[in-house]
Structure formats: structure tokens, C-alpha cells
């Protein structure tokens, strides 16, 4: 091996000095890794060992570490080092060393066949990697050779040991192929070669599996080996005998799990649907498992029922279309569907008593999609067969969605309750999907059941049953337009009759009412049937989320019909807010609900309600403004400001939100005079300034203040105009004292909405110049500590160029400094900041011709920008940002072509720039490609992606598969 070590001197260059990587030092480091209690020492040892594994010396010490006198941990490291050297540094191995390396690995595997299993596996993986690298040319019959060598009678190892070692090697070979870093063209060749080798492997596996004398450990290994090989997309018909043998092995409890895995992997191969005859032969085999399934369910054997269900679902889900097409076999497929239905409705509560039913849900989606994809005539036939099945499915799902008894539920862990919640969401999604198949009849079916349940005097009904039926309604109504359903009026009439004695039932009642809010908007006469229930529930903290979200939906959808109820809604809401019944987020939702509600009232009514609603908070804020800042009063201030901003988010008397709803919407006339929100903001403006003066250094408070105005601006649009001058002045003072990103975001909103209006341009221009000047000063002090400010600043600049380029005409704006700061921002590690900076340049470069100062700066400093872009593409920036940098290159090419053609050649001339991996020819090709493409932005993005892969040494590797 010394010879190989000399020849492979290049491998692992850059690791620690060669003398360090001796057998003795590796053993010491391993001892430190496994037994040293100090975590820092462990980490150091691990880092050193990783360097050792890739060093040239690994070829020497790895074989010595495999000596029989070493402990398994040390032997395992030696085997792993061999695998790493073979798989990652194959090109460093001289071709004349292949055979001796192969022979030594065979020798070691034979020796470890009766030794440590974990070491044996690593050695098998190393030999598998070697085989994949040599196939097909240097080792054309690799698998046949492996089988022949391990069947040799002259081996010192007993036949069972040899057999298990061979099976381990054959098992890891396809697994290593799946994870190997072979180039794409080699992968295709090796896959073809392995497919041919199936002819050697499968007969051997069949023989071992069917041989009565084969011990259980061998048969289990055979099943695992088969499971590994079928993932190479072996034709299903070639697997037929082994699949049948695996079905037979399901009766053996020791082989059950391995058999399930093998069968599921074989059935699930994408190519399997081509072999319909084989699939049809599998249906009776699956149906033959029904008695075993029933016995497992009866005995509470969750593992067995889970495994059999996986097999049935794998066949049904992967091949429903192919099997539906076999019309003459419709009864056997229907039997399979009914078997899966049994699995869906398996007795017990998920996830405590069973975990099987959740496996089946996607099958029902797939089957429905396949039925509905047939042409009309064929679809009608299948609808006739499968509509009753889907009605049965609805009953089964609603039964599975039922809560357990209160006593039983009380014993569930929080994790089990969360899993059950997610399971119910999955059932809800399935019901919503099934509606497409069953239509309005499904709602009628649910309504009839609920009606019978609530009106029957014969026997008391369980709340769980009622809740599940309502949950079914809610699932459908949340996403499907039920406005034309003739059962909803009856449902609304039934809801008040429900005896609510349980939180889960009350929650579902609330969510169901919320899901029907659009229907209530079309049938306002029914609002009074359910609104009292919602207002009553507001006072119950356990119903916080459901009651508040339902009230918000009703206020949003039905606001034009709520004025008669407004006083009551406001009074109840005020009461629960004052009593602090709800958590912060629900308080914010409640304020949004009240904003929707007030929007539909007359201005005088709005002002009156606003006064009574927010006066207590204004008084509290006045008191807090006098106090010395501390953490508790900060929370109170942020809470009050949040309530105000959420109220103003939805309080829209001009009904901008409704503009997209269509002409038929009932709108109130737009009121004349000042907007109520503006009136309130002007009244509290001084108070907000007072609060700010004490909290300017606190980003959270500043953010909360800015949020009030930002949300108001977004809602009010032009109605906000009277506030623009004083808000600009306040923002300027705020930002000059303590720069915060939220102030820049609000400035961006003002630029977006008001900068184009001559009356508002002067204060906005003054604010824009001020925040730009302050931010440029920040860059001089060191902007790396403020990526959020830089991000918001870049977005503001881009918005200014997009909305009002005149802002860049002012002589007081230092365009050169802005340009240089933006180039600096391109080098930030934070992706959002880089993205925002790229966005600025893509807005700036098209202005070269129309804004003189911009044209001048680009001419003087554009080369600096190009170099920054090339550095980023060369590897300095994340690959996910390459499209953004491509946009800059495209803009440079489109708007500064003559300059770019000169700069790009100069910039790419220095050797090693932007990457040492590039040849001069590759750089020249890239520059020519870019300069040629001035129309198709998508092509430029593709060029940049290709170039960055070359720069990073990733071109043609597996790393680029998803790129």
C-alpha cells in the first residue's frame, strides 16, 4: 500500500501535515472522540479525523486500522476512510491499482463476514463504490464476479457467513448508486449495466427465499436486498416471482416488516403501471391478506394492520388509473377499494388506538381524480359504481373525526392532541375534495343526518356526533361556494337548537357560522339567528380564537347589514377588551372586526363609536406617556398602538377595499368632509409624538407608531392627504435622532401614494433627502450592523425611481454616494438586503439617459458595479440570488451597452477572476453571450446560472440537479 500512498499524494491536499496522520494519532483521536467528556475536545478530534480521512495517508492507515487486534470503532473508521477515498477521490487512483484494491477489499469483506457487522457494511459500501466507478468498462461483470467469489468453497468462512456477506454487498450496491456523485452521463451507463445484472441477482434471491433450509436471517436479508434492487426501476414482470414469495413471507412475523417494505417498493416504482397483467395478479394476493388484517385489528396488533394497509394503499394509489381501465376486472378492483375503506375506518381513535387510517387519505384523492379524468360516458359508469362508495367514505371520515369521550381525551398528551388536530384537518381537506364528486347531495346528506340527530326524541345524542357533522359542513363551506345550497337556511335554523355543553362543540359551531358568513351576507334576515351566539361566545376565553375570527368574518362580509346590531357588537367587544379576556392577537382581530363594522356607518356614528371605543386607551396612553420608560409600560404602549393600527387597517369609509368586488355591490355614498380616521389621528398626533420622544431608541415602539400610519395610509389612500405634511416632519425628526427601518418603510408608502401629487411633493422630497442623508452617514460609520435599514433604504430608493424619478433630480441628492452605498450593499451576507439592492439598480440603470446625474455616475462608477456583480456570480453570493444579479447585467446591457462591452472584457481579464476555476475561453464565451442578448431576460438568467456553476466547480455534478 506504500506504493499507492506515493501515487495518490495529491488526494486530500490542504489537510494537516502528513506526519500527523499516523495510525497511532488516528487511534488517539478516536479515543478522544468516543471517551473524552469534554465537548470541545470531541469537536477538535472530529475535525482532525475528518481531515485525516481525506489525506493521502488514509490509504496507508485505513488498512492498518482494519487489523484483527483493533476494536470495532477503530476498524469502522478505517473502512469509512476507504469508502471516502474511493467515492470522492476516484480520479486520483491509478488504473493499474484497480485490481489490487478490489482484491484487498474482497479479502477484508471475507474476513469480516464473521466479524463486526457495522464494519462489514462499511467495507461492502466501499467495494460497491469501487464497482460503480469501474462499471461497465473496467469491470463489466461486477455482480456475477461478486457472486462467484463468495460462492467459492475454499473460503475459510462458513457458507451462511459468506451468504450474508454477499447479500449485504448486493444490498448496498443499488443504495450506493442512488446516493453516488457519478456525473449524469455515467449514471445512465451504470444504471443500464445494473439493470442487466438483475438477471444474476434475482434468481439467486428466489432460490434463497424459497429454499426450506434457508435460515430466517438469510431470508430477511434476501427481502432487504430485493427491496434495494427494485428501486432501480426494474420491470415489474421481472419481480413477479420474488413479490409472490414476499407475500408468502408475510405470514412469518420475523419477516413481516422486510416483506412489506419489499412489496411496497416494488409496487410503487413509477414504471410499474406499464405491467398491467402483473398488477392484476397482485390484486388477489392483496385481497388474500384481509383475514390477517382483521385478526390484527381484533388483537390490537397495530404493526401488522399498518403494514398490510401500506401494501393495499401502494397498489391502489399508484395504479388506480391503470386498474380502472381494466373494465372487465372492475369487481376485483372494487374489492381492493373496499379493503382500503376498511383501513380508513379502522376502529379506535387516531393516533392513540391506531395510526393506520391516515395512510389511506391520499388514495381517495387519487381515485377521484382518475374517475373524473375519464371522458363523460365512461365517467358516468364509474360514478354509478363509486358515488355510493364515496358517500360511505364521508360517513367513515366523520366517524373518525369524532372526539373521544371527555374523560378519555383528558388523558391524551398534548402531542397526541396536536396529531389528532392535524388528522382532522386532513379529513377536512378530503371532505372538501370529495364535494367535487358528490356535489350538493353531500350537503343534503349531512343536513338530513344533523336534522334527525337534533330532532329525534327517541335517544339522547352525543355531542361528538353533532360536532363531527357540523365539522363536515364547515370543511365544505370554508372553501366551496354554498350560497346556492337549499340546505343552508335549514342549517342556520338548526344551529340555535344545538345544546352546547362542550368547548370543542362550541368551537366548531363558531367556525361553522364563520364559514357561512358569505351566505349570511346574501341572506341578511338570518344574521339575527346566529349573531347572539357569537357575541355570547366572545366572553368565553376558551372560545377566543373561534369566536373572534367568526365575528371578524361576519363584520367583513355582512357589514352593510350590521348597522342595526352595531351598538350591541361594539358594547360587547368593548366589555371583553376591557376585561382582557383575549390574548393580544385576538384583541387585534377584534379591532379589525370593529373597523369593518364601523366602515358601514354614517360618519357621525363612526366618530361617536370611535370616541367611546378608543377614549379609554387614549387616556391610558396619556398616563403611560408621563411615566419613566420601563419594560411593563412598554408592553402596554405597544399593545395600545397595535389596537389602534388594527382598527385603522379595516376602517375604510371610502370603501377602497370593495372596489374590486364588482358594480352590483351595495355601497354607501362616499362621505364628504374629513375622514374619521384622519380626525382621530390628528387628535392623538401630539400624544403619539410625546410617546415617541421617550421611546425613540426602542425599535418595537417606533415600529408600532409607524404601523399606525402605514396601515392608515394603505387603507385611506388619498383620504390621508391632510396628514402628509405633519407626518413627513415627524418621520424626519424620528429618523434623524435614531434611524429605524420601520420609518423608511413608512416613507416608502408616502412616496408610493403621494409623491406624484404636486401639493405633496415638497414635504415628501424634503423627507426623502433627509433620510437619504442620514442613511449615507450611517454607511460611513459602518452599515454592517444595520442590514434591515439598508434593506429598507434600497427599497425606498427603488420605489422613488419607479414612482417619482424627479426625486433624483435634486442637486442636494448625492447620487454618487447613493450608488456606491448600493454597490456595498450587494456584498452583504443577508439575502433580502442583496435582493433589495439589485432591485434598486434595475430601476436606476434605465434612467441613465433621462437623469443626467445618474448617467454621469454610471459612466464613472459602473465598472465598480459590474465587478461587484461578477464577484457575486463568481461565488461570493448565494446561488439563490443569481436571477437578481442577472437582472443587473441585463439592465447594463440594455441601457449601457457600449460601456458594458468595454468594462466586461477588462473586468474578466485578470487571471483567477471571478474564479480560479475558469479558463480564459470560458470567460470570453460568457462575455460574448451576455453582450449578444439584449432582449431575452430569461436567456441571460440561464447564462448566469451556467456561469456561476462553472465558477463554483459544480457544473455537471449532482449538486445542480434542482438548480
Curated annotation (Swiss-Prot):
InterPro entries per record: ARM-like, ARM-type_fold, Exportin-1/Importin-b-like, Importin-beta_N, Importin_beta-like_NTR, Importin_rep_1, Importin_rep_2, Importin_rep_3
GO terms assigned for molecular function: small GTPase binding
Chief subcellular location: cytoplasm
Superkingdom of this protein's organism: Eukaryota
Each HEAT repeat, start to end: 24-54, 56-88, 95-135, 142-179, 194-231, 236-268, 276-325, 330-372, 375-438, 440-476, 487-522, 524-558, 562-600, 603-648, 676-716, 720-754, 761-803, 815-845, 860-893, 897-931
Compartment list: Cytoplasm; Nucleus
Family note: Belongs to the importin beta family.
PANTHER family per the UniProt record, alphabetical: IMPORTIN-13, TRANSPORTIN 3 AND IMPORTIN 13
Chain's role: Functions in nuclear protein import as nuclear transport receptor. Serves as receptor for nuclear localization signals (NLS) in cargo substrates. Is thought to mediate docking of the importin/substrate complex to the nuclear pore complex (NPC) through binding to nucleoporin and the complex is subsequently translocated through the pore by an energy requiring, Ran-dependent mechanism. At the nucleoplasmic side of the NPC, Ran binds to the importin, the importin/substrate complex dissociates and importin is re-exported from the nucleus to the cytoplasm where GTP hydrolysis releases Ran.
Protein name as annotated: Importin-13
Gene: Ipo13
Amino acid at each position: 500500500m506504500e506504493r499507492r500512498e506515493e501515487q495518490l499524494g495529491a488526494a486530500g491536499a490542504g489537510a494537516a501535515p502528513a506526519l500527523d496522520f499516523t495510525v497511532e494519532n488516528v487511534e488517539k483521536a478516536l479515543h478522544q472522540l468516543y471517551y473524552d467528556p469534554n465537548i470541545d475536545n470531541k469537536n477538535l478530534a472530529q475535525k482532525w479525523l475528518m481531515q485525516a480521512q481525506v489525506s493521502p495517508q488514509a490509504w496507508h492507515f485505513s488498512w492498518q486500522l482494519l487489523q484483527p487486534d483493533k476494536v470495532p470503532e477503530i476498524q469502522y473508521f478505517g473502512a469509512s476512510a476507504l469508502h471516502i477515498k474511493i467515492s470522492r477521490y476516484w480520479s486520483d487512483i491509478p488504473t493499474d491499482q484497480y485490481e489490487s484494491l478490489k482484491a484487498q477489499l474482497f479479502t477484508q469483506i471475507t474476513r469480516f463476514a464473521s466479524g463486526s457487522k457495522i464494519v462489514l457494511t462499511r467495507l461492502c459500501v466501499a467495494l460497491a463504490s469501487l464497482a460503480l466507478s469501474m462499471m461497465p468498462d473496467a469491470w463489466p461483470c461486477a455482480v456475477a464476479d461478486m457472486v462467484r467469489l463468495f460462492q467459492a468453497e475454499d473460503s475459510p468462512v462458513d457458507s451462511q457467513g459468506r451468504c450474508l456477506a454477499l447479500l449485504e454487498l448486493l444490498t448496498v450496491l443499488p443504495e450506493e448508486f442512488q446516493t453516488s456523485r457519478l456525473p449524469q452521463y455515467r449514471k445512465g451507463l451504470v444504471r443500464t449495466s445494473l439493470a442487466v445484472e438483475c438477471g444474476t441477482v434475482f434468481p439467486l434471491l428466489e432460490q434463497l427465499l424459497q429454499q426450506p433450509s434457508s435460515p430466517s436471517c438469510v431470508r430477511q436479508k434476501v427481502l432487504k436486498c430485493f427491496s434495494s434492487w427494485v428501486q432501480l426501476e426494474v420491470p415489474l414482470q421481472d419481480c413477479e416471482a420474488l413479490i409472490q414469495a414476499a407475500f408468502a413471507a408475510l405470514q412469518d412475523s420475523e419477516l413481516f416488516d422486510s416483506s412489506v417494505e419489499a412489496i411496497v417498493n416494488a409496487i410503487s416504482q413509477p414504471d410499474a403501471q406499464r405491467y398491467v397483467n402483473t398488477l392484476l395478479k397482485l390484486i388477489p394476493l392483496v385481497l388474500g391478506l384481509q383475514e390477517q388484517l382483521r385478526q390484527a385489528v381484533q388483537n390490537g396488533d397495530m404493526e401488522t394492520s399498518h403494514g398490510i394497509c401500506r401494501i393495499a394503499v401502494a397498489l391502489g394509489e399508484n395504479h388506480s388509473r391503470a386498474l380502472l381501465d381494466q373494465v372487465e376486472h372492475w369487481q376485483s378492483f372494487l374489492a381492493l377499494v373496499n379493503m382500503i375503506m376498511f383501513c380508513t375506518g379502522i376502529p379506535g381513535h387516531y393516533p392513540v388506538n391506531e395510526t393506520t387510517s391516515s395512510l389511506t387519505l391520499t388514495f381517495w384523492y387519487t381515485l377521484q381524480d382518475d374517475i373524473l379524468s375519464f371522458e363523460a360516458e365512461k365517467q358516468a359508469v364509474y360514478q354509478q359504481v363509486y358515488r355510493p362508495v364515496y358517500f360511505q367514505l364521508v360517513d367513515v371520515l366523520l366517524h373518525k373525526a369524532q372526539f373521544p369521550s371527555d374523560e378519555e381525551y383528558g388523558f391524551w398528551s398534548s402531542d397526541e392532541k396536536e396529531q389528532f388536530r392535524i388528522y382532522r384537518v386532513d379529513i377536512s381537506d378530503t371532505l372538501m375534495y370529495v364535494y367535487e364528486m358528490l356535489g350538493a347531495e353531500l350537503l343534503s346528506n349531512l343536513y338530513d343526518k344533523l336534522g334527525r340527530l337534533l330532532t329525534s326524541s327517541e335517544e339522547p345524542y352525543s355531542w361528538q356526533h353533532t360536532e363531527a357533522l357540523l365539522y363536515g359542513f364547515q370543511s365544505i363551506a370554508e372553501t366551496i361556494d354554498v350560497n346556492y345550497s337549499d340546505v343552508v337556511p335549514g342549517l342556520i335554523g338548526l344551529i340555535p337548537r344545538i345544546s352546547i355543553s362542550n368547548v370543542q362543540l362550541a368551537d366548531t359551531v363558531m367556525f361553522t357560522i364563520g364559514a357561512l358568513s358569505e351566505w349570511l351576507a346574501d341572506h341578511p334576515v338570518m344574521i339575527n339567528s346566529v349573531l347572539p351566539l357569537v357575541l355570547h361566545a366572545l366572553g368565553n376565553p376558551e372560545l377566543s380564537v373561534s369566536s373572534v375570527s367568526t365575528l371578524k368574518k361576519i363584520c367583513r362580509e355582512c357589514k352593510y347589514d350590521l348597522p342595526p346590531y352595531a351598538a350591541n357588537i361594539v358594547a360587547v367587544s368593548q366589555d371583553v377588551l376591557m376585561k382582557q379576556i383575549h390574548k393580544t392577537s385576538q384583541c387585534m382581530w377584534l379591532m379589525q372586526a370593529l373597523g369593518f363594522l364601523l366602515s358601514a356607518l354614517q360618519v357621525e356614528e363612526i366618530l361617536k363609536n370611535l370616541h367611546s371605543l378608543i377614549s379609554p386607551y387614549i387616556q391610558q396612553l396619556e398616563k403611560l406617556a408621563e411615566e419613566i420608560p420601563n419594560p411593563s409600560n412598554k408592553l402596554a404602549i405597544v399593545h395600545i398602538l397595535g389596537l389602534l393600527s388594527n382598527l385603522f387597517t379595516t376602517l375604510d369609509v371610502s370603501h377602497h377595499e370593495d372596489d374590486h368586488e364588482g358594480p352590483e355591490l351595495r355601497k354607501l355614498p362616499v362621505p364628504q368632509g374629513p375622514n374619521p380616521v384622519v380626525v382621530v389621528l390628528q387628535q392623538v398626533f401630539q400624544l403619539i409624538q410625546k410617546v415617541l420622544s421617550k421611546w425613540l431608541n426602542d425599535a418595537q415602539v417606533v415600529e408600532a407608531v409607524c404601523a399606525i400610519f402605514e396601515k392608515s395610509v394603505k387603507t385611506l389612500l388619498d383620504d390621508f392627504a391632510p396628514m402628509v405634511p405633519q407626518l413627513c416632519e415627524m418621520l424626519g425628526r424620528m429618523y434623524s435622532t435614531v434611524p429605524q427601518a420601520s420609518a423608511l418603510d413608512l416613507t416608502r408608502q408616502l412616496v408610493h401614494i403621494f409623491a406624484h401629487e404636486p401639493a405633496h411633493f415638497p414635504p415628501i422630497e424634503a423627507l426623502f433627502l433627509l433620510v437619504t442623508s442620514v442613511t449615507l452617514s450611517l454607511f460611513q460609520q459602518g452599515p454592517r450592523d444595520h442590514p434591515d435599514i439598508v434593506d429598507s433604504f434600497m427599497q425606498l430608493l427603488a420605489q422613488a425611481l419607479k414612482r417619482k424619478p424627479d426625486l433624483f433630480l435634486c442637486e442636494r441628492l448625492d447620487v454618487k454616494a447613493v450608488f456606491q452605498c448600493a454597490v456595498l450593499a450587494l456584498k452583504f451576507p443577508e439575502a433580502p438586503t442583496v435582493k433589495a439592492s439589485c432591485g434598486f439598480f434595475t430601476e436606476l440603470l434605465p434612467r441613465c439617459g433621462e437623469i443626467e446625474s445618474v448617467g454621469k455616475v454610471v459612466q464613472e462608477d459602473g465598472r465598480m458595479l459590474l465587478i461587484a456583480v461578477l464577484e457575486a456570480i463568481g461565488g461570493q453570493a448565494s446561488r439563490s440570488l443569481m436571477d437578481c444579479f442577472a437582472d443587473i447585467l441585463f439592465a447594463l446591457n440594455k441601457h449601457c451597452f457600449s460601456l458594458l462591452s468595454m468594462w466586461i472584457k477588462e473586468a474578466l481579464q485578470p487571471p483567477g477572476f471571478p474564479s480560479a476555476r475558469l479558463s480564459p475561453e470560458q470567460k470570453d464565451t460568457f462575455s460574448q453571450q451576455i453582450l449578444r442578448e439584449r432582449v431575452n431576460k430569461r436567456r441571460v438568467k440561464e447564462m448566469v446560472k451556467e456561469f456561476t456553476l462553472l465558477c463554483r466547480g459544480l457544473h455537471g455534478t449532482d449538486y445542480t440537479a434542482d438548480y
